C-alpha cells in the first residue's frame, strides 16, 4: 500500500494542535480545517498494509526503518490513493489536506520511493 505520513512540526504549531482530537480543533484554531503548512512529511513509500488500521499498527507499535517521525498518533495525517485521513482518538477521519503546503525536511530521500 502506497502511503504518505505527515506529522505536525511543533515549531510551526502556534495553536498547539499537535496530538489534539479532531473534535477540539476549532477550540484552538477557530476552525476544523487542517492547516497543512504546520505538517512535515515524515514517510513516503510502500508499507505492507491492507488498510489504515494496519498502517496504525505498523507505525504506532511496530515501527518502520524509514519512518522519520514519532510513532503514529492523534493529529497525524495518512494519505493513501483514496484520500487524506486524520488519525483521531478512535480510528481515522477523511479530511481535506493540501499536501502542497507541507514541508519536506532536508535532507529528504522520500522513504522507499
List each model region and its residues.
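Extended boundary segments
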Residues: 1-47
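Residue-level detector of intrinsically disordered/flexible regions characterized by low predicted structural confidence
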Residues: 6, 103-106
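Short non-domain terminal segments
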Residues: 14-17, 26, 41, 57, ...
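Short, conserved turn/kink motifs that form compact alpha/beta structural patches or helix kinks used as
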Residues: 27-79
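Short, compact, well-ordered microdomains
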Residues: 68-103
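Short acidic DE-rich linear segments
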Residues: 106-113
Amino acid at each position: 500500500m502506497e502511503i504518505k505520513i505527515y506529522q505536525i512540526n511543533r515549531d510551526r504549531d502556534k495553536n498547539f494542535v499537535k496530538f489534539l482530537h479532531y473534535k477540539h480543533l476549532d477550540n484552538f484554531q477557530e476552525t476544523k480545517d487542517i492547516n497543512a503548512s504546520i505538517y512535515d512529511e515524515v514517510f513516503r513509500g510502500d508499507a505492507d498494509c491492507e488498510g489504515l488500521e494496519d498502517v496504525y499498527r505498523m507505525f504506532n507499535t511496530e515501527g518502520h526503518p524509514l519512518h522519520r517521525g514519532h510513532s503514529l498518533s492523534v493529529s497525524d495525517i495518512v494519505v493513501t490513493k483514496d484520500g487524506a485521513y486524520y488519525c483521531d482518538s478512535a480510528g481515522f477521519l477523511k479530511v481535506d489536506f493540501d499536501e502542497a503546503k507541507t514541508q519536506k525536511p532536508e535532507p529528504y530521500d522520500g522513504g522507499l520511493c
